Structures are given as C-alpha cells and as structure tokens.
Amino acid sequence: PDFDGGLGFLFKWNMGWMNDTLRYFQQDPLYRKYQHNLLTFTMSYAFSENYILPLSHDEVVYGKGSLMGKMPGDYFWKFANLRLLRGYQVANPGKKLSFMGNEFGQFTEWDYRKELDWMLLGYEMHQKMQSYTRELNRFYLNHAALWQIDDSWDGYQWIQPDEQDLSIIAFRRIDKAGRELLVICNFTPVLREDLRLGVPKPGTYVPVFTSDAAKFGGGGYGSAPAESEEIPFREYALSAMFRVPPMSIT
C-alpha cells in the first residue's frame, strides 16, 4: 500500500491457495485423504498478506481446461464438485475472484476469439449452477462473518482440520459483532449421517445453506438441526452430531 511506502496495491493474489486447491479438487475423491494437507496448509499463511483467492482466466486457458473439466466424476458429480469448490472459495478468508463462465459451469476452456457457451443455459444443470452462484453470492453479502474479518484469526477458527480419513474439514467464520457461521465441507460422495464436531456455544445449530440442495442440482439429502451436547470434542467442551450431505459445503 502507498501508506506503507509501496505503489498502492492493497491486495495480493494467493497463488498458493489456488494451486493447492485445484490440485486437491482434481484428485479422485477416493484418494483425497492422502492430499488432505493441501486444504489445511494454506491457512498457515492466510493472514500474512491481504489476499485475493483467484479462480482466474489463467487457469482455464492454454490447454488447462475449464474448472468443470478439472472436476472428477460423471456429469452429476462434476457439478457437485464445482459447487463445492465455489462454496469453499467463498467460505475461506480472503476476497474472491472468479472468471466468467465459472458461474454456470462452462465445459470448454476460455477462448478469447469467441463468446462464452451461453447455449449451455438451455440445459437444466447449468441453469441450476447459475442459480447456485447467484444465491451463494447473495448469501456471502448478507453474512458479514464471511467477509468482515478476512485478515486475522479473529474471523476464522478451526473446528476439525484433520479428519483426513473422511476428507472432511469444519471451521467457524466470525464477524465483528461475534455472530458466527459453522462451515462443514465434505469432499467425498459419501453421506455422513452422524458426524460429531465440536461447537463453541450451547444451543441448536440450524442449516442455513447447502450446495447439495435439489434446486441447485444436488441430491437434496438435507441437513437436520443439530443439538449441542456436553460431550467434549478436541478443544471444545461441547459437541453436536451433524448430518453432512455428500460432496457438499453446508
């Protein structure tokens, strides 16, 4: 920044986050547990700069394929992975950048010589992907916990960083008023019926958003409210049992 003797740049692209995240998502979910550190390592330096989390044009050109093309699985699971990726980006601390075409799931990489493949919006799954992006952006704007404290641990706390065997992570996002969101990411196509996680406060934890919703093209498994219990989990005195849809962020 100029006030610190610099040239006036206030943000830096987090290329480490981008490289590690895309490398992780390109893995077959069966083997993601062996690459779990790609998810957690980025938080070791997340607050060393004012970062932007980029899913930019540079990753969808020159034979690299589109974001959708990088996702493993069949047609259904490619969309599930892409929704999870976009939600994971939004839930992590740092400002967001996403290149055009990502919002509706373009299959071909970007070609500067022609327009985007808008005809894909004639297909239901691409319409639902676009709707997901719209509602995800609105959810982000309406919940200050996701953007108000992006530069310190005051706005982010781990709940479960190392459940590598299940390929699950969970964390808290916190705003300046102390309001919180509890975020659970399931990086496998397996429904987790009774996942115990630590919780910071007593009460009922009610699902407010999930990428698995049927209206977004997901399986529509749903997540029931979870009641806290006086059962310690890791550093938390309380915990709760959560129902976590497959390949989703909730």
Regions found by a protein language model. Name each.
Residues 1-31, 40-46, 107-110:
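Substrate-binding cleft/loops of secretory-pathway carbohydrate-active enzymes
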Residues 5-26, 55-75, 121-135:
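Short, charge-rich amphipathic segments
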Residues 28-68, 92:
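Aromatic-lined glycan-binding groove of carbohydrate-active enzymes
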Residues 32-34, 63-64, 73-98, 102-250:
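Carbohydrate-interacting/catalytic domains
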Residues 1, 55-58, 101-104:
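Short, well-ordered beta-to-alpha junction loops that form the rim of enzyme active sites
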